[in-house]
A protein has these predicted regions:
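Short, well-structured N-terminal submotif of metal-dependent ribonuclease cores
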Residues: 1-36, 46-62
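Acidic, PIN/NYN-like endoribonuclease modules and their adjacent C-terminal/linker elements
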Residues: 2, 107-143
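Generic structural signal for small/hydrophobic residues in well-ordered secondary structure
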Residues: 8-9, 44, 81, 110
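Short, well-ordered alpha-helical scaffold segment located
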Residues: 11, 40-43, 123
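Short, contiguous strand/loop micro-motifs
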Residues: 12, 44, 92-94
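Short linear capping/connector segments at secondary-structure termini
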Residues: 41, 61-65
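Active-site neighborhoods of divalent-metal-dependent phosphate/nucleic-acid chemistry enzymes
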Residues: 69-123
Length: 143
């Protein structure tokens, strides 16, 4: 069975602005192997530069919902995320919740779906180590 990918915001921004990672994003999307996190969608909406970009995003989000490929945080993800943030703070010595809570929700979305999280942010590997200590597995591809 082929992997399903959940691209984080960094990948979509590089794809939209600079056409980076286009082969992976296009091929995965065309073959129906992409899950969109509602948290990633929120960040993309926040960064939309034009009405045209917003409309394109509207169509993408709706199409992902239609094929049940739109992942929203589950009720228990908020508490799980808090525990992970506490562990991350202990691991790193300090962390600001505002800097990481969205990452945690995206990560948990990938874990919940069994998807490979694709990111251009190498720091995401730290979360994989923390999840491993909790008995969970983050499948991660850093570009």
């Amino acid at each position: 069975m082929a992997d399903v990918f959940l691209f984080d915001t960094s990948v979509y921004i590089a794809y939209i602005r600079r056409k980076e990672h286009s082969e992976l994003v296009d091929r995965s999307t065309e073959s129906g192997r992409v899950v969109l996190s509602s948290v990633v969608a929120m960040e993309l909406y926040a960064g939309a530069r034009s009405v045209a970009e917003k409309r394109l995003l509207d169509r993408f989000v709706e199409s992902m919902k239609m094929v049940s490929a739109y992942e929203t945080p589950r009720e228990d993800d908020w508490a799980r995320g808090g525990v992970l943030l506490e562990r991350f703070t202990r691991f790193r010595g300090h962390a600001l919740v505002r800097d990481h809570f969205r990452d945690v929700l995206v990560i948990l979305g990938a874990v919940n779906r069994g998807a490979v999280l694709v990111s251009s942010d190498a720091h995401m590997a730290n979360w994989g180590n923390i999840l491993k200590r909790q008995g969970e597995t983050l499948r991660l591809k850093v570009l």
